[in-house]
C-alpha cells in the first residue's frame, strides 16, 4: 500500500482518539456522551467539566488535525495536496465517528480548525476572527463553527488565484463545510427556531 494511504488511515485512527471521553472518564468517571448535549467535544466538556478540561480538550483536538496534515505533507511532497487533504478529512471523520468508541464522537470543529489552520492559514485566520466575533456577540458556538467552515471554503476559493492553493485544498474546504453542516443539522434547526443552547448555559439532558 502506498505511504500516502497509510497516512490517511493513520489520520483516521488518530482522529478517533476522543480526548473529551478520556478526560471525562478520568476526572468524573462519566461518559461525556451521556451528559450535557451528548456531544464528545470541547463545548460539551465546558458544560460538564468546566473551563480547564474544556481548554485541554480543545487544544488536543486541534493538535490531532495539525499532526495529521503536517506529517502527511512532509512525507508526501509529490502528492499535489491530495493526500494531505484526504488525511485532514480522515482525521475529522475519525473524531466524528471514532472506531474506538462505537462510532459515536463529536462534531469535529476543533480538529477542523487544526486541519485548516495548517493547510490554509490565512483563510482560516480571517474566517476564525469573524467566527469568534459571532460567538462573542451571539454566544452561539454552533453558529460560529458554521461560519468558520463556510467562510474558509469561500476564502480559499477566492484567494487561490493569488496564493496558489492546490485544487485539493479547495475540495477539502468544501467537503469539510458539508461535513460540518451535516453534523450541526440539529443545531441549525434550533438556531432557526431560536432554541439553540448558548455558551455559558448548562444543559443537563441530551
Curated annotation (Swiss-Prot):
Annotated EC: 2.3.1.275
PANTHER family cross-referenced by the UniProt entry: GLYCEROL-3-PHOSPHATE ACYLTRANSFERASE-RELATED (PTHR30309:SF0), INNER MEMBRANE PROTEIN YGIH (PTHR30309)
Enzyme class: transferase
Keywords: Cell membrane, Lipid biosynthesis, Lipid metabolism, Membrane, Phospholipid biosynthesis, Phospholipid metabolism, Transferase, Transmembrane, Transmembrane helix
Family listed: Belongs to the PlsY family.
Tree of life domain: Bacteria
Transmembrane segments: 3-23, 51-71, 83-103, 113-133, 162-182
Membrane topology: Multi-pass membrane protein
HAMAP family xref list: PlsY
The protein's assembly and partners: Probably interacts with PlsX.
Pathway where this protein functions: Lipid metabolism; phospholipid metabolism
GO biological processes: phospholipid biosynthetic process
Catalytic reaction annotation: an acyl phosphate + sn-glycerol 3-phosphate = a 1-acyl-sn-glycero-3-phosphate + phosphate
GO CC annotations on file: plasma membrane
UniProt protein name: Glycerol-3-phosphate acyltransferase
Amino acid at each position: 500500500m502506498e505511504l500516502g494511504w497509510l497516512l490517511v488511515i493513520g489520520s483516521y485512527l488518530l482522529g478517533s482518539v476522543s480526548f473529551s471521553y478520556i478526560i471525562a472518564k478520568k476526572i468524573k468517571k462519566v461518559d461525556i456522551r451521556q451528559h450535557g448535549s451528548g456531544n464528545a467535544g470541547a463545548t460539551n466538556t465546558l458544560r460538564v467539566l468546566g473551563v480547564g478540561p474544556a481548554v485541554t480538550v480543545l487544544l488536543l483536538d486541534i493538535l490531532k488535525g495539525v499532526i495529521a496534515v503536517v506529517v502527511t505533507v512532509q512525507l508526501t511532497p509529490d502528492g499535489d495536496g491530495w493526500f494531505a487533504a484526504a488525511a485532514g478529512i480522515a482525521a475529522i471523520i475519525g473524531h466524528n465517528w471514532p472506531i474506538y468508541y462505537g462510532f459515536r464522537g463529536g462534531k469535529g470543529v476543533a480538529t477542523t480548525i487544526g486541519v485548516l489552520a495548517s493547510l490554509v492559514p490565512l483563510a482560516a485566520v480571517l474566517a476564525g476572527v469573524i467566527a469568534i466575533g459571532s460567538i462573542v456577540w451571539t454566544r452561539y458556538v454552533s453558529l460560529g463553527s458554521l461560519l468558520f467552515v463556510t467562510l474558509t471554503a469561500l476564502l480559499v476559493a477566492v484567494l487561490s488565484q493569488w496564493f496558489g492553493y492546490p485544487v485539493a485544498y479547495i475540495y477539502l474546504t468544501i467537503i469539510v463545510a458539508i461535513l460540518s453542516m451535516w453534523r450541526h443539522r440539529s443545531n441549525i434547526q434550533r438556531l432557526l427556531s431560536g432554541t439553540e443552547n448558548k455558551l455559558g448555559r448548562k444543559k443537563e439532558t441530551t
